[in-house]
Design a protein with these regions (language model features):
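Active-site loop/oxyanion-hole signature of alpha/beta-hydrolase fold enzymes
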Residues: 42, 51-96, 271
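Short beta-strand/loop motif that positions the catalytic acidic residue
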Residues: 219, 225-227
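Catalytic active-site module of serine/aspartate enzymes centered on a nucleophile-bearing elbow/loop
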Residues: 249-280
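Short glycine-enriched nucleophile-adjacent loop
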Residues: 98-109, 115
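Conserved alpha/beta-hydrolase catalytic His-Asp/Glu region
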Residues: 128, 150-205, 214-215
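Flexible "cap/lid" loop of the alpha/beta hydrolase fold
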Residues: 113-147
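Conserved HGGG/HGGXW glycine-rich cap/lid loop of the alpha/beta-hydrolase fold
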Residues: 4-66
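Acidic catalytic loop of the alpha/beta-hydrolase fold
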Residues: 230-234
Length: 280
């Protein structure tokens, strides 16, 4: 089926379902939308009934102009499951999506089968000033993307990608990596349905109140944590901290990859996800 809309906790949420089998819900990260799963969506739909959606304040979902919290995002995810009559699902989150999934797992363990966390945080590692700088950079990024999407994307890629992959994208922007995506595709995705300055502020508010470290030991679900060796945004050490606190968790480090490891190392990441979710 194509994209659909549902009224979730008073907010119109856009979602898409594809594939058959056990349900798998994908939760995207900050400033992104459901299209961020370009390297995962189709490969995973060959094995699962995959649901991807735009968080409130992102993509084609409604963008109520008030500060968001991680619990609000988790409640939306739970309510979407109820709307779709899904009692239990695997749930996967990348970056901010991984933070939402951790919050969701603490509050709604009965709704989860297995958990996959990719390049995420159990708490904001800096102070309020650091968060303010991050917010200002993201708002500047919004204007840069509107002005020159290509330049803005490759500039941002310095932080997100391992240097050799970024270099290859710049040299050959039309190359289809793993038959799944090109740099041109990623530039297009990064510049459509942009999170506006007020959306950025509302999403960042969720980070400012976020710390689940003390609650992670309550998560009993089997959990796979995929960290990236060269991640400069959600460092490997933070994913190791999550692993140390979730009792039934397994940590795999993707080598020679940055925060964008689901793209840089798509076949490897997808294989880890599929094997973990399919295993008894």
């Amino acid at each position: 089926m194509g994209k659909e809309f549902a009224l979730i906790n008073g907010t119109k949420i856009c979602y898409e379902i594809k594939g058959e089998g056990e349900p798998l819900i994908l939760v995207h990260g900050f400033g992104a939308d459901k299209e961020v799963w370009i390297a995962q969506f189709n490969p995973l739909t060959e094995h699962f009934k995959v649901i991807r959606f735009d968080n409130r304040g992102a993509g084609e979902s409604e963008r109520p102009d008030h500060p968001y919290t991680m619990e609000m995002f988790a409640d939306d995810t739970a309510a979407l499951m109820d709307h779709l009559n899904i009692q239990k699902a695997h749930i996967l989150g990348w970056s901010l999506g991984g933070m939402i999934v951790q919050q969701f797992a603490v509050k709604y363990p009965e709704k989860i089968n297995k958990i996959v966390l990719i390049n995420t945080l159990p708490k904001w590692p800096g102070d309020d000033k650091g968060l303010q700088v991050y917010q200002e950079n993201e708002i500047q990024g919004y204007y840069k993307k509107r002005e020159n999407p290509r330049a803005a994307y490759f500039n941002g890629a310095k932080l997100g990608f391992y240097r050799t992959f970024r270099k290859e994208m710049i040299q050959n922007p039309k190359k289809k990596f793993y038959g799944l995506f090109s740099a041109e595709d990623l530039i297009r995705i990064s510049a459509h349905n942009l999170s506006r300055p007020q959306d950025i502020k509302n999403q960042i508010h969720a980070l400012s109140r976020y710390d689940v470290v003390e609650d992670l030991s309550k998560i009993q679900n089997e959990t796979l944590i995929l960290a990236a060796e060269k991640d400069r945004l959600t460092p490997k050490s933070m994913n190791e901290l999550i692993h140390a606190h979730i009792p039934n968790s397994k940590l795999i480090v993707i080598e020679k990859a940055g925060h964008e490891s689901p793209r840089e190392k798509a076949p490897e990441v997808n294989q880890h996800i599929i094997l973990f979710l399919k295993s008894d």
